[in-house]
Amino acid sequence: MIILKRNIVFLLIIIIVLGIFIATSIEIKNYKLSLNQNKNEISKNPPIWPAPFYGQFGNNSILISKEFNFTIISDSTLLLNKTLSKYYNLIFTQDNLINSSSNTLNKLNINLKSKNEILKFGFDESYKLIIKNNENSKLEGNTVYGIMRGLETFYQLIKYNFSDNSYFIENCLPLIINDKPRFPHRGVMLDTSRHFYSVDTILKVIESLSYNKFNTLHWHIIDSQSFPLSSKSYPNLINGAWSKSEIYSYHDIKRIIKYGKENGIRIQLEIDMPGHAKSWSVGYPDLLPHGWNDSTTTIKCPDYDVPLDPSSPLSLPISFGLLSEFSGTDYGYNPNYDDKSNNLFNLTVDDLFHVGGDEIEYQCWNNSKRIKDWMNENNLKTFQDVAKQFQLKIIKQLLKIGKIPVLWEDTFQLFYKDLPKDVIVEIYHDQSTAINATNNGYKIISSIARYWYLEYSYSNWIRAYNFEPTLNISKSNIHLVLGGEGAIWSESIDSSNLFQKLYPTSSAIAERLWSPIYYTNLLNAKSRLQSFRCSLLKRGINSAPLNNSSPLSAFSCYNS
Amino acid sequence: MIILKRNIVFLLIIIIVLGIFIATSIEIKNYKLSLNQNKNEISKNPPIWPAPFYGQFGNNSILISKEFNFTIISDSTLLLNKTLSKYYNLIFTQDNLINSSSNTLNKLNINLKSKNEILKFGFDESYKLIIKNNENSKLEGNTVYGIMRGLETFYQLIKYNFSDNSYFIENCLPLIINDKPRFPHRGVMLDTSRHFYSVDTILKVIESLSYNKFNTLHWHIIDSQSFPLSSKSYPNLINGAWSKSEIYSYHDIKRIIKYGKENGIRIQLEIDMPGHAKSWSVGYPDLLPHGWNDSTTTIKCPDYDVPLDPSSPLSLPISFGLLSEFSGTDYGYNPNYDDKSNNLFNLTVDDLFHVGGDEIEYQCWNNSKRIKDWMNENNLKTFQDVAKQFQLKIIKQLLKIGKIPVLWEDTFQLFYKDLPKDVIVEIYHDQSTAINATNNGYKIISSIARYWYLEYSYSNWIRAYNFEPTLNISKSNIHLVLGGEGAIWSESIDSSNLFQKLYPTSSAIAERLWSPIYYTNLLNAKSRLQSFRCSLLKRGINSAPLNNSSPLSAFSCYNS
């Protein structure tokens, strides 16, 4: 009887696995079929970047009439209207002389299935785009963010003829695109401490992320070099800004989060602690370990990596205060800060909150009698224990106020046996840590320096494109890979070279993270990426040529 | 009696000259005095870039109340309202918590003296800005363009305090600025043939020129590599564009001219001829000399410098057609083009029209029997005679349709004895040609390559700043120096590195051309330029650091 039951269970498992396998195979086969139907090669498909999950394309073309509009056939929202209007203005910048007829495309039906606009980890970005003829063309999304992604695809399909002043879609109709991202977390990290970026520049970055179908801006807002974040609970912190004008106000942060929402981009804040804290001390000198910059000691503390001193009576209050303030909760630690009406974010702030944890230079604590006394009192034996205790407090506080903590891999390396499983680990050194962390049940975000850091002279789109974040991760753990990020560490980057460092390398990461793995290869990526780059340039996003440097000689953007 | 009369005339001349000298001296002295009053050094003055013609500054500060507005005390115009609204939004991007009182600045009176909005060479950009207290602060301009320049100065005076959410003007009140440009022609040349720049990018360039108090965009629109200009009279010319989407439509050009007007920037078109014409021939192959690319001949024609063939029956009709079409006249040479309703520019196009004339490679004509036969028929002995005859026809046609021809110095070198004096010569090789041209009575624009071309690796702001366009020009000819231009030749420049090549070098040129010569020295330029660069970055104009390259390490924009 037991054996029979076991056999039935076994049979069921086999059936389920086979079913999944067949379904997946059909999906893959369908896709591949559609790519090759009528002897069309991949290169004959319209150059959509990142490539969609599923696409089926015919050979017909259609003119778009001057009466063309988006026709909402579902309930509408303010954000949906704003999005449609934005893309209408992006697409139709020229005169259109084509009168509507039964042979022209006069409308695209828009079907928004849910009015839920909450932007949080895993939000729905899927969409379905069908273009056949005038009556049967539609764009469907579960959320307005799916509609945004679909409109970006629609934008990329439309061309303009300067000779007869007409818009058209060429050689790909009827068209069915069923699209959704491969990974839920796809972003770029921007460091605004080493150089300050104006709000206008950050908004332009957000806009550009949306064109790439990214969904997250990881904002590494402060670091050792400057503290540009204006805090109401600890107003002296901005004394650590580069200058009196290189600062982000509440008003600025609200604009950035609002613009993120309008572009389907989560704004994930990082307040890096306890390392990289020199800038904190300009306003509150007691935050740093005593004697850290004593020039007479043999063990030197690196100037820009000095960490907070966990034994300082200010360290926890200020750290907790910042977490509360910038996650929009009312757990404020500062008794002077009880103006709830000025609560910054409410529901708009992301559910992931990054607290750094990288590169804690323990030797900086070595000169401080205060720390050593405090270690004795608290029964902490090593500086590693000090770091661990501090970080655990931060993590627990974040969990208490309802946020999911994200930390750089150093934290995992330091004490993964005691690290809560809710923590998401961001990998930047090596894939081996990704394997190790997932084997230990941690969710990870991939941002491995030699592939996805964007500031190096050797960074380029092919290198970035070829890195697969699930590499050597066991199949049962692949669901723990949440996605990845390109990173703009800004020692050698400021506004003047930001976009040429961001793109096209980040665009390659965008496709790696959005498109099916069997599509993400170099087969026809280059020409599609060149086309996509042209579409970025057209919209004022100043991507470098594919050589990742400056232009070598006169060329079309389609060959650069 | 005759001697007496002569003496009286002589005396009068002496009195007038003395009068001018004394007046100028007083003006200079006043300015210098104001710079040193109360032992204030130049560096204590507010960091306005480019420095104003006359400024007088006190030591007081003032808060700007949240009720602040621009109050028009004269007649108004749509453009004036749009300009005030633009600067209001540029300045007031943050919360302002300051209530109005008798001690705050609550308004700036705006006095527009003339509604004349015609943008042409020499238009009035002067303004007077007085800020004392709430009742006696005003900005006065003869034209709306003077108001624009004054608002830019006002913008640069205002700071924000992130600690108490207030706007203020610091340590310089009462303030009187009497400002006007030193030269009437101050611009940047943009080459859109070697790389195509999107309309959005060109609009951003125009916006940036206005912040620099430039007044001209010299648009080198076509060249050998591509022909992005969509012509209704000769529609096949756009076959020479890089691609079917790297083209400027009428609609685009109108947007660019309209935006120029909104920023006080003349859009001066250049249609370079007869050299650099390879791209013309894609649509009209017969325009080029027969046999130009014959590989068997010993004298080679450089691929990208092949000129038009003046003996082609198409050369003059197409050249004249383009001049007519793009200067908005109705002297169209193409009988098929008589749609006057589609006239492009009407009054909005600039009165200066550039027709190139540089680098005509005569040897490219050497293989063509057609040219040689035609030379015999027309009694032309040398290829130089061919070029001269063609250019004279172009110049006369331009004068006939009411435009002032501008040509590169090659034309002056080729036949200055027969060149009409109406022609403006743009100098790019050497100051000696500037001296020679002015000695021969020609007006010049200075754009000498080794100082004011912006694409070289050695280009930098100090080099550009130190070049004085009137150098060694005799005093009696200085009025013939109309101004100058920084030049973006785009073989190695595209949208991705455009702004870091444009700025800060062009900003240095902007001050050289706007500010009094006795002020234009390196004394306090660096810190003012750094401040100005910060103000550009804030507005999304991504100037390189002052090293003209990428950032060397983490820094404030005020030290970069």
UniProtKB/Swiss-Prot annotation, chains A, B:
Keywords per UniProt: Glycoprotein, Glycosidase, Hydrolase, Lysosome, Signal
Enzyme type, top EC level: hydrolase
Catalysis performed (reactions): Hydrolysis of terminal non-reducing N-acetyl-D-hexosamine residues in N-acetyl-beta-D-hexosaminides
Signal peptide positions on this chain: 1-25
Top-level taxon: Eukaryota
EC number(s) per entry: 3.2.1.52
GO BP term (any one): carbohydrate metabolic process
Recorded family membership: Belongs to the glycosyl hydrolase 20 family.
Record's protein name: Beta-hexosaminidase subunit B1
